[in-house]
Amino acid sequence: MSYSDKRDQYAPHMALVPMVVEQTTRGERSYDIYSRLLKERIIFLTGQVEDHMANLVAAQMLFLEAENPEKDIFLYINSPGGVITAGMSIYDTMQFIKPDVSTICMGQACSMGAFLLTAGAKGKRICLPNSRVMIHQPLGGFQGQATDIEIHAQEILKVKSRMNELMAKHTGRPIEEIAKDTERDRFLSADEAVEYGLVDKIFTHRD
């Protein structure tokens, strides 16, 4: 997780988005694949977590809540992490809305991606069998005058403490253990993520 927003690093581009054509009473209607999946209450969180992506994910969750506040939302995560403030806007929206948000890790959920994976509704946090999860402490890289660096160092320590508190809440592990385990990058397989309490189960096939 990065404390600062280095926007030039976070510019994922999709060269080709498949289109889906559906037959309706009024003729054919085409959707891009992600819009079609949104109709099934599926949201994709892929690539770096940054402000633009976070706004889109939050907006989709709010839209689905308005459509049906009782029906689950499915958030598929394949992310190396990103900016903390952007990730926290997604986290707060997940906790705020009425529908349960089921989180599914495909590929990887690292750093802020892992945090959002763990923030899903209890009993509905899932890893696919060959996915991996990585947790660590927030990263900082502020430059400037000594006094400003000190201010930002104090702030990132506050953020670190808050993130540890929330991870402890969602995993059920002691905050001291979370703090120790996130001092360095810690990679976990799907099985290890279940054992640690980051997710609840592994899905190999649909029921």
From Swiss-Prot:
Catalytic activity: Hydrolysis of proteins to small peptides in the presence of ATP and magnesium. alpha-casein is the usual test substrate. In the absence of ATP, only oligopeptides shorter than five residues are hydrolyzed (such as succinyl-Leu-Tyr-|-NHMec, and Leu-Tyr-Leu-|-Tyr-Trp, in which cleavage of the -Tyr-|-Leu- and -Tyr-|-Trp bonds also occurs)
Residues at the active site: 111 (nucleophile), 136
Subcellular location: Cytoplasm
Alphabetic keyword roster: Cytoplasm, Hydrolase, Protease, Serine protease
GO cellular component: cytoplasm; endopeptidase Clp complex
EC number: 3.4.21.92
CDD domains found in the cross-reference section: S14_ClpP_2
Name listed for the protein in its UniProt record: ATP-dependent Clp protease proteolytic subunit
Primary enzyme class: hydrolase
Its biological purpose: Cleaves peptides in various proteins in a process that requires ATP hydrolysis. Has a chymotrypsin-like activity. Plays a major role in the degradation of misfolded proteins.
Any one GO biological process: protein quality control for misfolded or incompletely synthesized proteins
Record note on quaternary structure: Fourteen ClpP subunits assemble into 2 heptameric rings which stack back to back to give a disk-like structure with a central cavity, resembling the structure of eukaryotic proteasomes.
Entry's family note: Belongs to the peptidase S14 family.
GO molecular function: ATP-dependent peptidase activity; ATPase binding; serine-type endopeptidase activity
NCBIfam families noted in UniProt: clpP, PRK00277.1, PRK12553.1
